[in-house]
Design a protein with these regions (language model features):
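Beta-propeller blade termini and top-face loops
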Residues: 1-206
Length: 206
């Protein structure tokens, strides 16, 4: 049916009259929708691709099944620690940051992963096998988590004094630990920043 149209977005829309009027396409599934496939032989069978994975509908989008047995996610960056076996840290689109084991007895399942940050997860780096530094988009929520005590120090992002031109941050702003001194951290927006005390103080170095 050429008049049956879909416009995908964070609130996908549907038209049944060639685009003259639009309504919300579906509820309870998706988020940032990226692709939809419709069976050419049965238009009621649909597969939706979105930031959290895929959804399957057999009734034209009225009801959906989220295929939660598929390990689907959009990772921006990966970090590891020095545990044995080591843990993997990942920043994920729309799903924050997660930590999971690199190996275990039996298979690794979704339940083995724990949430360690919010927003759109970005960089996750570990110093001294104890301090985790991570952030969300545009360096938001940049903080330090003590993996031994679970104490979190948030708001480590550097801001210039009021009245000065503020920094511009990339969607995923790099965080790097010095290989020579684990207390020294580098963070970057439109300038490179250096901290000598685990992110508690910053100096512009570029």
């Amino acid at each position: 049916n050429a008049d049956n149209l879909f416009m995908l977005s964070s609130g996908s829309q549907r038209s049944i009259d060639g685009g003259r009027e639009w309504v919300r396409a579906w509820q309870g599934i998706g988020g940032d929708d990226h692709a939809v496939a419709i069976d050419p032989n049965n238009s009621r069978y649909m597969v939706l691709g979105y930031d959290h994975g895929i959804g399957i509908s057999r009734d034209g989008g009225q009801n959906w099944y989220h295929a939660d047995n598929l390990p689907l996610a959009q990772f921006y960056s990966i970090g590891i620690d020095e545990a044995y076996p080591y843990n993997v840290y990942g920043g994920i689109q729309d799903n924050g940051s997660k930590r999971g084991p690199s190996s275990r007895v039996g298979s690794i399942s979704f339940e083995d992963w724990e949430r360690i940050g919010g927003g759109d997860g970005m960089y996750n780096v570990v110093a001294e096998n104890r301090y985790l530094y991570n952030e969300s988009q545009f360096a938001g929520g940049f903080g330090r988590l003590d993996l031994l005590t679970n104490e979190r120090s948030s708001n480590l992002r550097y801001n210039r004094p009021q009245g000065e031109e503020q920094l511009r941050w990339n969607w995923n702003a790099p965080i790097v630990i010095s290989p020579h001194d684990p207390n020294v951290i580098y963070h970057a927006g439109n300038v490179v920043l250096r901290s000598t005390h685990r992110g508690e103080n910053w100096t512009e170095i570029s």
